[in-house]
Amino acid sequence: MIRQYLILFMFFLLLGGCAHQIDTKTTLYDDWKPRLAAQKTWQVEGKLAFISPEERQSANLNWQQTTNSNNLILTTFIGTRILSLKQTVNGAELEFDGDEYFDTNAAELLKRLTGFTLPVDNADNWLKGTIDDQSLVVDELGRAKQVLWFDNTGKKWQIDYGTYVQNAGYWLPTKLTLKHQQIKIKIQLYDWQFK
């Protein structure tokens, strides 16, 4: 008799546990896009692939932004640092091959020393998918799908947003592709954090 009650108790306990599963997704803000655009302190990790007719390169990335600085660190897949690029109001600093270099523009400094073209100066808008432009195409949920955009140096970029994840009340891009002439940059993002 006690055994039957114990089995019945365990059955109801199991049933109750299934009925109260916790949803791991956060609630989406109704005004998620303007809130995300206003969010100026963030960090994201991911992978980056640079593809041109001459070469193909890939790296892990750690991108951090605060109200005063933008810091991009690229590492190999085993964790060896390739470069560190920091932009502040005072200028840009690039650590590459054990040396430090300085300039006023982070994207130009990166291009000059590595040959790598990436519009790092406006990353806050295009990386989060909050870019606002007349050419912007959005999906049925209001998320950026594609945009033609000019960076600070006048280069025209086509940015295609592949997939999103719902996190911290926002829709955040997880896969995007940037194209400029014959250059293609594929970025996969994960582990978005906001402070």
Give short role names for the model-derived ranges.
Residues 31-41, 115:
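N-terminal helix-cap/turn-to-beta initiation motif at the start of protein domains
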